[in-house]
Regions:
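Hydrophobic membrane-insertion alpha-helices, especially the h-region
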Residues: 13-30
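Short beta-strand element of the alpha/beta-hydrolase
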Residues: 69-79
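The serine-hydrolase catalytic nucleophile loop
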Residues: 81-89, 105, 187-188
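Conserved alpha/beta-hydrolase
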Residues: 90-110
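Gly/Ala-rich beta-loop-alpha elbow adjacent to hydrolase catalytic centers
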Residues: 133-142
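A conserved short beta-strand
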Residues: 151-163, 173
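Short beta-strand/loop motif that positions the catalytic acidic residue
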Residues: 170, 176-178
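Active-site-adjacent alpha-helix of alpha/beta-hydrolase-fold enzymes
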Residues: 178-232
Length: 293
């Protein structure tokens, strides 16, 4: 039989449990709240003289006004970062003749929809070559997409990110771009990370750059302040990403490229004539400089 004193105690315990639930829900909501956008992000959501713009669902697309393009870039946002934060960067890239689509993610977490690229590609059959980029968690998930969908993506740009697994044999034209002041910079360029990326991956450290300036948002926790402007860092990110897309355009039609055939050794020919040290040897046409990138 419940005593008169027992009922208030149960009521108090119930109120405490309810309060704990409310606090937990509030903490979860706060932790998932997206980072505030900067005005430049909102201003990018529209057409400009050198780029067209379209919103598809909750994702954003930028492209050249001519609508003539064959290479597309899909961007996965960082955790708790809205797609619009990458609008100014997408505009810079699209102005050079590319389709750039910044994907929207459930709860702004790319880990909840790693295959978001599939629906985007299905919407654009005119694109014949695809690359993928991502910032932070979005970059890790972009790399995971490359690993789990072999032969689909031809290029990968990691913006302040590193792969969660080995994609060294994927054949993609890869670049890793990060600020030297980013708290995770050492991991992004570590020997372990390099081993998990294709051997010809291009690493682009941005002196004085940080994590947050990969986009146009603010409030990134535990991020050291940058010593260069956001616009300067964005320009370097765009340049390095465009270099990756140029490599994608230069790839052969067959992708991944077939492994070189191993045949019987060629029969030895006559010995080569010695070259006099005084005789100049003409350079092969189109040969690259030893100091080339």
């Amino acid at each position: 039989m419940a005593t008169r004193h027992g009922r208030p105690r149960r009521r108090t315990l119930g109120l405490i449990a309810l309060l704990a639930l409310v606090v937990a829900a509030g903490a979860a909501a706060w932790s998932l709240r997206p980072q505030p956008l900067l005005p430049e992000a909102q201003a990018s959501l529209g057409a400009k003289p050198d780029t067209a713009f379209k919103k598809v669902g909750e994702s954003y697309e930028w492209m050249p006004p001519s609508m003539h393009y064959s290479v597309g870039l899909i961007v996965y946002p960082g955790a708790r970062v809205l797609p619009a934060a990458y609008g100014p960067l997408a505009q810079r890239i699209a102005a050079h003749g590319y389709l750039v689509v910044v994907a929207s993610m459930p709860l702004n977490l790319a880990v909840l929809d790693i295959d978001a690229a599939n629906a985007i590609m299905a919407e654009h059959p005119e694109v014949t070559r695809w690359a993928i980029a991502g910032h932070s968690l979005g970059g890790a998930m972009a790399a995971q997409y490359v690993g789990t969908h072999p032969g689909v993506m031809r290029g990968l740009a990691l913006w302040a990110a590193y792969p969660p697994g080995d994609i060294s044999t994927s054949g993609v034209a890869a670049t890793s771009i990060f600020g030297t002041l980013d708290a995770g910079a050492d991991k992004m360029a570590s020997p372990d990370t390099r081993r998990e990326l294709p051997p010809d991956t291009v690493f682009v450290p941005i002196a004085g750059g940080n994590h947050e300036q990969m986009g146009w948002y603010t409030g990134q926790p535990n991020d050291p302040p940058a010593t260069i402007s956001r616009d300067d860092q964005q320009g370097q990110v765009a340049e390095a990403t465009l270099a990756m897309l140029a490599r994608v355009q230069a790839q052969p039609d067959q992708f991944p490229a077939p492994a070189p055939s191993v045949g019987p050794p060629a029969s030895p020919g006559p010995p080569a004539s010695p070259v006099s040290p005084a005789s100049p040897v003409p350079a092969a046409s189109g040969a690259s400089s030893p100091s080339g990138a």
